[in-house]
Amino acid sequence: MRIEKLLPPTPPAKTWTVALEGGKMLRVTESTVLDQGLFAGLELDEAALDALRSAAASAALRARAVNMLSVRAMSAGQLNEKLMAKGATERQAAETVAWAVDIGLVNDAEYAKALVRHYQAKGYGLYKIKNELYRRRVPKADWEDALAEMDDAEDAIDAFLAKKLRDPEDRKECKKASDALARRGFSWSQIAAGIERRKYQTD
C-alpha cells in the first residue's frame, strides 16, 4: 500500500491526513508521522499499514474524548463507558482514558469535589450526593475527601423548611416536607431535627 499524499493539519485541526492509494484517508498525529517516518510515496507493508491504522484509530478516539470533555466534565469510568458505546474496544477505551488522565483532562478526585459542591449548592443531602457519585462512576477512593468538604446540612434543611413548611404542627404538611427532604438525600434524623427547629422558629 502506497502513501499518495501526506497533508499537514489545517487549523484548528491538529492531525495530519494520510491519503493512501485507492482513496482511503487516515488521520494521524504529528508524532505518528515522525515516529513512523511517513512521506508521500512511501510503500507500506502489512505490518506498517496495521500500525498506521492503529495510530489513526487512537488519534480519532483521543479527539473524540477531547470533544466529550469540552462539553462537560466526567469521571474516567464515564469516559471509558462512552467511548465503548461509540465503538471503541475495551483496550482502546482504556488506553484513551489513561492518556486523558495523564495529561490532566480527567481527574476523578477533583471531579468528585465539583459534584459535591454542585449538588450541595442545589440543596441536596449526603445520600443523594453519594448516589450521584456512584451513578457517575466516581471511584469510591475519591469519595471521602470530597464529602469531607460538605457544609453542615442544617442550613439547607432549615432553608427548605422555611419555604415549604408553614405550619410545623400540621402532620400532613410535615409528612409532605419530610418526604421531599428524604428524596433530596437527607436522613430521617436530620429531617426530624429540622422540623423541631422549625417549630421553635414559628413559636
Predicted regions and their residues:
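An alpha-helical, amphipathic repeat domain used for nucleic-acid recognition
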Residues: 1-203
